[in-house]
């Protein structure tokens, strides 16, 4: 979910790769905005009956990268009351330049701001909502090490490994292998588990 509604990328934006059991998607965080999301969650019987609600937060496509942290903070504040956990998605290949947040300097600042805000929200709501970080499978070992150190330093509760890849290794035989977007499914099993 993003602060403001956005329609995502133009259709078609999902392509099945039947020979290799993969999917390429370029959805682009299509959603109705964080306020509509929270209202929908509050109305759901699943939430009302104590179901576990995980919410994935990201930045709007039109938000400049210099203001990306503000989008994450807006979303965290809005979803905190209803979330069982919050995923900080910095790894979608379908939002221009979003993966830049995976570099250690950008990520350090983002995690500092989010964990400081979580501390304030924890006092306000009387609960500490776990924060998860979702990373790309395309990272180099050194980047993974830097991210792991930041996760430990800022006491991030979990790591979601991984989002989709921009690699097209192992799917060259597919008609739609050239489509832009993130590849998921069986073709990235080894990459996401390295």
Predicted regions and their residues:
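Generic structural signal for well-ordered alpha-helices
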Residues: 34-45, 72-80, 104-115, 144-149, ...
């Amino acid at each position: 979910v993003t602060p403001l509604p956005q329609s995502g990328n133009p259709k078609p934006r999902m392509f099945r790769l039947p020979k290799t059991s993969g999917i390429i998607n370029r959805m682009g965080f299509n959603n109705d905005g964080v306020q509509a999301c929270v209202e929908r969650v509050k109305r759901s019987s699943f939430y009302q009956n104590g179901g576990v609600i995980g919410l994935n937060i990201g930045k709007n496509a039109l938000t400049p990268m210099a203001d990306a942290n503000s989008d994450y903070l807006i979303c965290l504040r809005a979803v905190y009351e209803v979330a069982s956990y919050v995923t900080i998605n910095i790894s979608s290949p379908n939002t221009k330049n979003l993966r830049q947040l995976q570099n250690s300097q950008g990520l350090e600042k983002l995690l500092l701001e989010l964990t400081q805000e979580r501390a304030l929200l924890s006092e306000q709501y009387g609960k500490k909502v776990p924060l998860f970080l979702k990373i790309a499978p395309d990272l180099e070992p050194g980047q993974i090490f830097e991210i792991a150190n930041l996760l430990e330093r800022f006491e991030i509760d979990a790591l979601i490994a991984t989002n989709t890849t921009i690699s097209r290794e192992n799917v060259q035989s597919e008609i739609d292998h050239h489509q832009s977007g993130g590849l998921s499914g069986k073709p990235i099993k080894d990459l996401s588990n390295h």
